[in-house]
Amino acid sequence: MEKNLVCKLVKAMELQKGEVVLLNFWGEDTEIQDLYDFVGAVAAEGAMPMTLLHTNQYERELVENMNGEVPEKWMEQFAIVDTVIDIIEKPAGLPPADLSKEKYPVFGAYLQKLFGAFSKKKKMIQVTMPSDTNAKCVGMEPEAYKERIMKALDIDYAKMKTDCQAKIDSFTGNVRTVRTGKDCVLTLDTTGREWIADAGDGALPCGEVYIAPVEEKSNGKVYFETLSVEEVGVFHDVTVTIENGHLISSTNEEFNAFLKELPENGDVVAELGIGMNPNVTGVLGDSVLDENVIGTFHIAIGMNHLFGGKNVCPIHYDFVATGIVE
């Protein structure tokens, strides 16, 4: 990624002078320059960077040779951290390909310890990078993927914040109605819940407003011209049925099989979001970007306790569609 774009992203994060920022790098040694560019950009904003590496070699050497749990003394170094920035060149949390299977539980416990500590910080920001690995994960050619990500990142962040707030302010009342297809209507109760603007200090690329609806009070149907489920498949002309906050069925048998395999509370409607990024076009099956496409909305199932809901669940799936949100 170009250094000037890194500086633009960090400026949009609105870091405070004197705060401590942990740069959590998920990538390889060949991509390490990106980390160094973030170090410089954070320092230029008056904040102080710390770094934590998660290259395949680092993770393998650490976990293969660990004896016992992560010491609390080691975890204490993160007590001073105000903001965590994940620099994601590869999917965060996946074990190294050559890690011994018997070490998987150790790796999982290590990550759980880190995520538990980081989730309590003032800000957690995830930057999806234009890497070959990320392109492969979404089934796109590297150059096309890089162009799409870079364009999505290179926006006017001040205008994005203004546009997102204007969208939030346009809603009145505590019930949102979503109209899709010819006659599909979904109602969601948002009483007591607050809209959140994702405009530069959450996930990057950004560009959405979202809310956690009351879990038991979503009812109706949603039509998807294309329903993309990460690591499961892409389905066409699908209508899903939601009753009392649960996505209970669909018109596609493969998707129904996916629903049956979800963990407890995995079918709970967890989020309503609206895409706001003018530089992202076309729903291509990449959930990181698809949910930001201007003119789309998305519903999610699974976890929402981290953004105003009460559903605790190990999964979170976003499903993007076109329609009218009132």
Write out the residue ranges for each language-model feature:
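Short, glycine-/Ser/Thr-/acidic-enriched flexible segments
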Residues: 28, 90-92, 131, 193, ...
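Short polybasic amphipathic segments
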Residues: 176-179, 238, 248-250, 321-326
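Compact functional segments
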Residues: 308-326
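Active-site bordering "gate/hinge" segments
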Residues: 1-219, 229
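Long alpha-helical, hydrophobic tracts
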Residues: 1-10, 25, 37-47, 226, ...
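A short secondary-structure junction signal
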Residues: 97-98, 136-140, 199-201, 233-236, ...
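Oxyanion-binding "anion nests"
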Residues: 205-251
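Dual-mode signal for accessory low-complexity, basic/Gly-rich regions
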Residues: 217-219, 249-310
